Amino acid sequence: VTTGPGTPTGAEAGPRGVRARPDATDRALIRAARLGDDLAFRQIVDRYGPQMYRYAVRLVGGSESDAAEAVQEAFISAWRGLDAFRGESSLRTWLFRLVHRRAVDLQRKRKPTPVTDEALTGLVAPAVDNALQHVLDEELLHELQAALNELPWQQRAAWLLREVEEHSYEEIGEALGVPVSSVRGLLHRGRRTLAERMSRWR
């Protein structure tokens, strides 16, 4: 994932020559990036890019190109909006909110695509009982795919953020722009739908 047009080169780094360490905190990386340290921003990309891509590719139904585009645009928005980030949420939550919005925009422009078997392989364990974690045959994947495809967009997003990315309810609410009470409702309805569809596998 690249940071997109407008990212400064190393020679254009901030006036104080700030360089963030590899183990720098998010807050330190943001401070350095605001001063023009492109390496600090690249550390942010390296730190959160893989998580954002994993979330995006499953959210958009397994389209790697759409997921990559959503992540790319999210980081471009993040770079351009560094000064607007006030730290009211964590950096991770802010970035996930950006990639979620970009993914939503992409899906509005295109017809919904089904979740692919490849995207579901890593989701089977969270979705079924422990006794079925080793039953990864085609029929199970097909049924889980169909169940996830039936979930409304917000329910699917909430489920992925909670069950796959292990976000807190508060983080999910901030990423989706809804209160925690709504997050609980989305997860409850999504889990109930999945449980009903997957009941014969229990």
Regions found by a protein language model. Give the residues of each.
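Short, charged helix-capping/linker segments at alpha-helix termini
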Residues: 19, 34-43, 54-73, 180, ...
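N-terminal module of bacterial RNA polymerase sigma factors
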Residues: 1-51, 125, 149, 196
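DNA-recognition helix of helix-turn-helix
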Residues: 100, 104, 144, 155, ...
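Structural recognition of an alpha-helix C-terminal capping motif at a helix-to-coil junction
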Residues: 69-76, 89-101, 185
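Amphipathic, Lys/Arg- and hydrophobic-enriched alpha-helical face
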Residues: 45-64, 81, 148, 193, ...
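Arg/Lys-rich amphipathic alpha helix in sigma70-family domain 2
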Residues: 80-87, 97-117, 137, 198-200
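Internal acidic/polar
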Residues: 14-15, 19-26, 113-141, 168
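Sigma70-family region 2
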Residues: 34-35, 58-62, 73-90, 109-111
